[in-house]
Amino acid sequence: MIPMLIWFIVIVLIALLACLAIKFLALRIVLALLLTLPILLSVAFCVLRRSPVQESNKAVFFNATSIISDRGEAHGSVHKNTIPAFRQAKQNGADTIVMDVRMTKDGMLIVLLPDSVDTDNATYIVDETHWIQMSQLNVYGGNNGTILTFDEAVSWCEANKMNMIWHIPSFSSDLLTYLRNKIMQDSLYDKVAVTTYNLIAAGRIRCTDRQLLMGMIWKSTEYSIVNGTAVGNMYTSWYYSMMDTFTYWGIRSLLLPSFLGVDFLVTSVDDADRALIVESSASGMRTIIYDMETATERNYFANQMELPMIVNDLVSLLGTGNSSPTTPPSSSTKANKNRS
């Protein structure tokens, strides 16, 4: 309702400006600039837009990707973003692993979802803490509670012939340089893709590397609703609603992904429909579905539409393997949950 009201006010203001422009020269100039703005934006779009990956590594990656485990399978005392979680995912049928990649203050890459870790004595923010300190934290509890390094995770996936999707929650040029060097060193262009929410990060990734597969994660309520709760108050909620409106129509029209050179869209099951999937495919963009919870959703998107899917719990959704009852381990540290 509020976004529609804002658009209505904008249209009324432009109409009022047009009426006043009949009398005032300055307003005629302003109105002319406003009316030529769409033309200028169209020209800039055509000149600055980036192309998605055209090489064969795109087909190779997606031909080998169908069941994607969301940070591994966390059953029993196993935690996500750990080697045991990756191992359980492989045993339960996954062919690809999503992992969160962050960089410490001294340039060490680690696999961790939250941007900080709380202990009884202090809070450690990842990009402000050295690896020597992070490596001593027992984040998950038990005997294997230390943080997994990026190189360890990649080595395991390579040894077990698993494709990888590296999710970048926090972007930096140093992080991108490390990822590119790792890909070139191990020849991983047909085994790796990166994903991000950040539009600026997506643009910088494509400008830097035209072979690296890049995906954009999006959801129609990404900014206005977090963990089922509305963001902001009665005075600021309109801003988050406007951001969601901008993102929604930017994605649905394919303007944003086409401009950034995105190779695939990671779309929530609530926002996915056949029209978007077909239009994306016609534009050279693949679709990956996430947030699936029912067998009906799985049958439609995975079996009928033949789309790759990101699965949080392979056992419950696909009925693969057996998981032991979940028993939360004791832990001396607690992770501050961040937006996945």
Swiss-Prot record:
Q: Which GO terms describe its cellular component?
A: plasma membrane
Please state the span of the N-terminal signal peptide per the UniProt entry. 1-21
Look up and give the membrane topology term.
Answer: Single-pass membrane protein
Q: Where are the transmembrane segments?
A: 25-45
Cellular compartments annotated: Membrane
**Low complexity compositional bias: what residue ranges?**
323-333
Q: Which PANTHER family does the record cross-reference, listed alphabetically? A: GLYCEROPHOSPHODIESTER PHOSPHODIESTERASE 1, PROTEIN CBG16011
Tell me the ranges covered by the GP-PDE domain, including all copies: 66-300
Name the keywords, alphabetized: Membrane, Signal, Transmembrane, Transmembrane helix
- Name the Gene3D superfamilies on file: Phosphatidylinositol (PI) phosphodiesterase (3.20.20.190)
Listed under GO biological process in this entry are: ethanolamine metabolic process; N-acylethanolamine metabolic process; phospholipid metabolic process
Q: What InterPro entries does the entry give? A: GP_PDE_dom, PLC-like_Pdiesterase_TIM-brl
UniProt organism field: Caenorhabditis elegans
Q: According to its UniProt record, what is one Pfam family this protein matches?
A: GDPD
UniProt-recorded name of the protein: Uncharacterized protein T09B9.3
Q: Which GO terms describe its molecular function?
A: glycerophosphodiester phosphodiesterase activity
Region named Disordered = 321-340
